[in-house]
Amino acid sequence: MANYTAADVKKLREITGAGMMSCKKALEEADGDFDKAVEFLRIKGAKDVGKRAERTAAEGLIAVSGNTMIEVNSETDFVAKNAEFKEFADKVAKAADEAKANSAEDLAAVNVDGTPAEEALQAFSAKIGEKLALRRATTIDGDNVAVYLHHRSADLPPAVGVMVAYEGEGDAAKEAAHNAAMQVAALKAKYLKREDVPSDIVEKERSIAEATSREEGKPEKALPKIVEGRLNGFFKDVVLLEQPSVADHKKTVKQLMDEAGVTLTGFRRYEVGQQ
C-alpha cells in the first residue's frame, strides 16, 4: 500500500519540476519521507529542486530606507502599481529603519504617523479595497550600505531588493559595492563566504554529490576528487565572494572587491513572493 498521497505527488512536482512517475518513484524509494524524496530526485538529476520551493504566490513590492528593507504584499499587481501603495510602503520602510525592524512582528509595531504600522495598513487596505500584508523586514549593520532595487518591468514597483554592507572609501568602493548588490540580485547568493555555509548543509551536499557520482558510474578511485569538484561548484553557486562576477566573468566577486579596496561584511536579498 502506498505510503504517500496524490497531494504529496503534486507538491513534489511543484517543488522539483520532475514528472509524475519520477515523483511517485521517489516517494516510494523514500518510504513516504518527503525530504528524502527531494534528495532522491536531486541525485537522479532534477535541476530546479530548492529554487522552486522558495516560491510563494504574492504580488507587492520591496522598499528600502537606510539600513532596512521591507516587503509589503498585495493581492494583485494592479494595486502594486498604485502610486499611493508605494508611498505608503516607503513611509513604513522609513519608520522601520528608525526602529531597526528585523522581523514581521517588529514591522507591524513600528510607528507610522502615530499609529502602529499594522493598523495603518488595515486602514489603507480598507481604502483601496484589497487585502495587504506587511510580510517581513530586515536591518543590516554597517556604516556603508549599497542598495539595488530591480524592477521586472517599467510599470511595476521593485520586486527584488538587495542591501550590501561594506567597508571602503571613495567612488570606486561605492561602484564595486553597487555591482556586488546587482550580483546578489541576479545570481541569488545565499552566503557571503564559504565559512558561513552551515556544516550540515555542506555534508548534505557532499553526500548528494557522492551518490550522484556513483549513480553516474564514476570510478570509485576518482570519487573523492569528483565530489570535491562538485562541492566547489555548489560553493560557487551559493557563496557571493566565490561567484564569477557578472561585471567581469574572468574574475570572482572577491577578486574585484580586493581590487577596489572593498570588504563586504554582509548582505540581504528580498524578492516578492519568495521565502
UniProtKB/Swiss-Prot annotation:
HAMAP family for this protein: EF_Ts
Region described as Involved in Mg(2+) ion dislocation from EF-Tu: 76-79
Major localization listed first in the record, in broad terms: cytoplasm
Family label: Belongs to the EF-Ts family.
Localization terms from the record: Cytoplasm
Matching Gene3D superfamilies: 1.10.286.20, DNA helicase RuvA subunit, C-terminal domain (1.10.8.10), Elongation factor Ts, dimerisation domain (3.30.479.20)
Pfam family, one: EF_TS
Keyword Cytoplasm in record: yes
Protein name (database record): Elongation factor Ts
MF term (GO), any: translation elongation factor activity
Keywords: Cytoplasm, Elongation factor, Protein biosynthesis
GO cellular component: cytoplasm
Job description of the protein: Associates with the EF-Tu.GDP complex and induces the exchange of GDP to GTP. It remains bound to the aminoacyl-tRNA.EF-Tu.GTP complex up to the GTP hydrolysis stage on the ribosome.
Keyword Cytoplasm listed: yes
